[in-house]
Regions:
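SDR active-site strand-loop-helix element
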Residues: 6, 30, 73-77, 116-121
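A short helix->loop->beta-strand "cap" motif at the edges of active sites that frequently abuts
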Residues: 111-114
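Conserved glycine-rich Rossmann-like NAD(P)H-binding loop of the short-chain dehydrogenase/reductase
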Residues: 22-38
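NAD(P)H-binding glycine-rich loop region in Rossmannoid oxidoreductase-like domains
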Residues: 55-97
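Rossmann-fold NAD(P)-dependent oxidoreductase module
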Residues: 15, 19, 108, 156
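N-terminal Rossmann NAD(P)H-binding glycine-rich loop of SDR-like oxidoreductase domains
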Residues: 1-23
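Rossmann-fold cofactor-recognition segment
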Residues: 43-58
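Catalytic helix-loop patch of NAD(P)-dependent Rossmann-fold dehydrogenases
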Residues: 92-104, 124-157
Length: 157
């Protein structure tokens, strides 16, 4: 299968891309930087095709995903500086990336009938439950701005 992986400059995207390639899949990575800026560890992700993409730019998302023609998208890109996301001057940017960017990717995947996997976070729950969360649990209680915007991303998918 051919995968398009967002956020390969971060830990999650880096590891997802390496695992896909290790399993014999074709992978195209992306992140906001002009060139790959993740860990230069010589692993497969550092040698794989890479495209710069600002996921908050709806037209760019459409153009890039249409050009890659993936069988599936694994969306790992996110604003992950949890504490900094609480700063009043950062909230709009965090929401634009985690919710709006995810919406942009989901819209294109739907239009192209392309599978999409979205990686969220446990911060969409408050951690106060007394029993394990069930897969279809809707008892959301985001802990902070990061959790709220990742939940908005979940709902976009």
């Amino acid at each position: 299968m051919k995968f398009f992986v967002t956020g390969v400059g971060g830990q999650l995207g880096h590891d997802v891309m390496n695992e896909l390639i290790k399993r014999g899949h074709e992978g195209v990575g992306s992140d906001i930087q002009e060139q790959y800026s993740g860990v230069e560890d010589g692993s497969e992700v550092t040698k794989a095709p890479y495209l710069s993409l600002d996921i908050t730019d709806k037209e760019a998302v459409k153009r890039v995903i249409e050009s890659v023609k993936p069988d599936a998208v694994i969306h790992c890109a996110a604003w992950t500086a949890v504490d900094m996301a609480e700063d009043d001057d950062k909230v709009a940017k965090v929401r634009a990336i985690n919710a709006g960017g995810t919406q942009n990717i989901a819209d294109v995947c739907k239009k192209l009938d392309c599978k999409m996997t979205y990686i969220s976070t446990d911060y969409v729950f408050d951690g106060q439950g007394t029993e394990p969360w069930k897969p279809d649990c809707k008892d959301y209680k985001p802990m902070n701005v990061y959790g709220q915007t990742k939940l908005e991303g979940e709902l976009a998918v």
